[in-house]
Amino acid sequence: MVMTDNIADMLTRIRNANQMHHLQVVVPISKLKVEILKVLKEEGFIKNFFIKEFKREIIISLKYTIERERVIKGLKKISKPGLKVYTSVEKIPKVLSGLGIALISTNKGILTDNKARLEKVGGEVLAYIW
């Protein structure tokens, strides 16, 4: 099976594991996925992630509250292989009035919507996470 949208696959795996309250989820490795996971960890949406180089996979540790509530309430892939969505710095969207984040692929790497505004760069809107 040929996978055309690796990011959508990773987000779907995270969403499904999160809904089932799994502690970890495994995804195939790629540089873009690692960059996205760094942002998710920095923003507090995941606990951690580990790269297993010899198996070419990433193990993502999901994060829950003390009451076993999900930290990630929702994920939505915005840019798709058939329809790329780009934004300028003036039109960067706010997710749930600032409660969530937009992942934006810029020439300075993968940034959140807030960091992209601070850096004054636009780019491809990859996903919304709240």
From Swiss-Prot:
The organism of origin for this protein: Phytoplasma mali (strain AT)
GO CC annotation terms, alphabetical: ribonucleoprotein complex; ribosome
Subunit description: Part of the 30S ribosomal subunit. Contacts proteins S5 and S12.
Sorted UniProt keywords: Ribonucleoprotein, Ribosomal protein, RNA-binding, rRNA-binding
InterPro entries in UniProt: Ribosomal_uS8 (IPR000630), Ribosomal_uS8_CS (IPR047863), Ribosomal_uS8_sf (IPR035987)
Record-given protein name: Small ribosomal subunit protein uS8
UniProt keyword Ribosomal protein present: yes
One function term, GO molecular function aspect: rRNA binding
Taxonomy, superkingdom: Bacteria
Family membership: Belongs to the universal ribosomal protein uS8 family.
Function: One of the primary rRNA binding proteins, it binds directly to 16S rRNA central domain where it helps coordinate assembly of the platform of the 30S subunit.
